[in-house]
Amino acid sequence: MPEWRTCSFCGYEIEPGKGKMVVEKDGTVLYFCSSKCEKSYRMGRNPRKLKWTKVYQDMKAELKKAQESQ
């Protein structure tokens, strides 16, 4: 059974047979769900600052929970 992967940039799951696997010179394996994620990674963008990434949305939800509990 093929495995679901997680995008190395945005954090969303990648369906088997979709996306792109990139191996860097140092042997690090990166998975990207779209060319948008790959290009953003290559340009050095921070996924925590982009509203469309799951990483940003999860971080925002944690902050909201912390503020509500205070």
From Swiss-Prot:
Listed GO biological process terms: translation
Cofactor note: Binds 1 zinc ion per subunit.
Organism: Methanocaldococcus jannaschii (strain ATCC 43067 / DSM 2661 / JAL-1 / JCM 10045 / NBRC 100440) (Methanococcus jannaschii)
Keywords, comma-separated and alphabetical: Metal-binding, Ribonucleoprotein, Ribosomal protein, RNA-binding, rRNA-binding, Zinc, Zinc-finger
Protein name: Large ribosomal subunit protein eL24
A molecular function (GO) term: zinc ion binding
Similarity comment: family membership: Belongs to the eukaryotic ribosomal protein eL24 family.
Binding site for Zn(2+): C7, C10, C33, C37
GO cellular component: a single term: ribonucleoprotein complex
Protein encoded by which gene: rpl24e
PROSITE patterns found in the cross-reference section: RIBOSOMAL_L24E
Its job: Binds to the 23S rRNA.
Taxonomic lineage from the root: Archaea, Methanobacteriati, Methanobacteriota, Methanomada group, Methanococci
Gene3D superfamilies found in the cross-reference section: Ribosomal protein L24e
Assembly behavior: Part of the 50S ribosomal subunit. Forms a cluster with proteins L3 and L14.
CDD domains: Ribosomal_L24e_L24 (cd00472)
Alphabetized Pfam families for the sequence: Ribosomal_L24e (PF01246)
Domain of life assignment: Archaea
Zinc finger (C4-type): 7-37
